[in-house]
Regions:
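Active-site/ligand-binding-proximal alpha/beta "capping" segment
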Residues: 159-211, 255-260
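Short gly/pro/ser/thr-enriched loop/turn and capping motifs at secondary-structure boundaries
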Residues: 141-147, 184, 212-215
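Solvent-exposed alpha-helices and their adjacent loops that cap or buttress functional pockets
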Residues: 73-75, 104-106, 128-129, 146-150, ...
Length: 274
């Protein structure tokens, strides 16, 4: 991570050196001025430069999180990311299901990636920690500190959600989504969007808990598909499987099929999740 004082000073100096050019090229290739449309600044120039410098510093920190996390996560592939609620208690059936699934995935040769916190995240790490492959936690620093669970062979701390979510997607060959709240839904739809738009290759997105997910899936079919906002093929991106052994079979079948394309794709680790 870059030294904060040095990085901020560098960003501040860079901000002071920038001279704003109000002329831009429009879609017709003509040079146009934005001055007539730009609002009058509400803050003094010095204050705005300081804010810009701090924003530049945050960009540097985000880049450093990408680089550092990427280097560490290369060693743990292939991996499966498991999403789910931080509030699920240890005696809940979803916790116990996740614990068993993660252990089986770990013994089958897949590292297991979770958010590193309590609840479903803890169950995923705990199951993998007892198995043959690494348990990985992608921990996030929050205003109300998320306590990292103790079942992590590799623990990576993030200040920003953006690089953390990318690491969940980039370094996994499949995504298992347990019941959860806003954070889980965010991770689910992030994965769906990246696969749907081709920004990441097709990988299994497996929902666990028919009773929990059926209402959302019905709404997606009725409102999104029914209004033509998604294609019928987009529904095939989601699998609903409540049996842990069938989940592993689904992941293995997809992973082995992907390995057959290794010769065609060469060293494209993003495409293969390797």
């Amino acid at each position: 991570m870059p030294d904060e004082s040095i990085a901020f000073q560098t960003a501040s100096e860079h901000s002071n050196q920038i001279s704003y050019n109000p002329f831009r090229t429009n879609h017709k290739g003509k040079s146009v001025s934005l001055l007539k449309k730009l609002p009058k600044p509400m803050l003094p120039d010095e204050t705005r430069r300081e804010i810009q410098a701090r924003e530049s510093y945050h960009v540097l920190k985000i880049i450093s999180e990408f680089v550092e996390a990427g280097e560490e996560l290369r060693a743990i592939q292939p991996a499966v990311s498991i999403y789910g609620s931080a509030r699920t208690p240890e005696n809940h059936p979803d916790y116990e299901f996740t614990l068993r699934l993660a252990r089986k995935l770990s013994d089958a040769g897949f590292s297991v990636i979770s958010g590193g916190g309590p609840g479903i995240m803890e169950a995923a790490n705990k199951g993998a920690f007892a198995g043959a492959s690494p348990a990985v936690g992608l921990n996030i620093v929050l205003p109300h500190e998320q306590k990292a669970n103790p079942y992590q062979d590799l623990s990576i701390k993030f200040q920003h959600f953006f690089p953390r979510k990318v690491m969940f997607v980039k370094h996994a060959v499949a995504y298992v989504v347990m019941p959860g709240g806003f954070g889980t839904l965010d991770e689910l739809f992030e994965s769906l969007t990246l696969v749907q738009t081709g920004k990441t290759p097709n990988r299994p997105i497996i929902l666990v808990g028919g009773d929990f997910w059926s209402g959302l899936l019905d709404w997606i079919r009725k409102e999104l598909l029914g209004r033509g906002l998604i294609a019928a093929a987009d529904m095939d991106l989601i699998r609903l499987i409540d049996d842990e052994d069938k989940i592993i079979e689904e992941i293995f079948a997809h992973y082995e099929n992907r390995l057959e394309t290794l010769g065609e794709l060469g060293a494209d680790t993003w495409s293969l999740g390797l």
